[in-house]
Amino acid sequence: MSHLVHLTVLLLVGILCLGATSAKPHEEINRDHAAELANECKAETGATDEDVEQLMSHDLPERHEAKCLRACVMKKLQIMDESGKLNKEHAIELVKVMSKHDAEKEDAPAEVVAKCEAIETPEDHCDAAFAYEECIYEQMKEHGLELEEH
């Protein structure tokens, strides 16, 4: 599995661990609930069953609609707000979920998110979601945060 695919898998696991609805972003969900959420987003984004399968199997998006599916899930989990910007509080929680706990690096999740919050992102929310995803992984690596294996 390529490095980027592996990172995408972990990001999606982290996102899906945070919550299922915008009202309860930090509730854990199971695979069935994640599929339900992805299918809800499928209808909203024009994504296909294949795009949902790709998301559920943690493969990189190939089509624009698949990126939009990812953005939709991020918005429903309040990782990304309705204007396409990173939600600092929820993104920090995401980084904490995704990384192994290291007391010496307690401030690192906030630093990761601060860097990613400041990046120039495309106006298109679908492409922005992907840009944030890449930034989070890059910054986690730079801050020495190890990804939690799920």
UniProtKB/Swiss-Prot annotation:
GO cellular component: extracellular region; extracellular space
Family indicated by similarity: Belongs to the PBP/GOBP family.
Signal peptide: 1-23
Annotated SMART domains: PhBP
Cysteine disulfide links: 41-72, 68-126, 116-135
Keywords: Disulfide bond, Secreted, Signal
GO MF entry, a single one: pheromone binding
Subcellular compartments: Secreted
Protein name: General odorant-binding protein 19d
Classification via PANTHER family: GENERAL ODORANT-BINDING PROTEIN 19D-RELATED (PTHR11857:SF42), ODORANT BINDING PROTEIN-RELATED (PTHR11857)
Single GO BP term: sensory perception of smell
Expression tissues: Expressed in the antenna, mostly on the anterior surface of the third antennal segment. Also detected in the maxillary palps and in cells at the bases of the taste hairs on the proboscis and internal taste organs of the head.
Primary location class: secreted
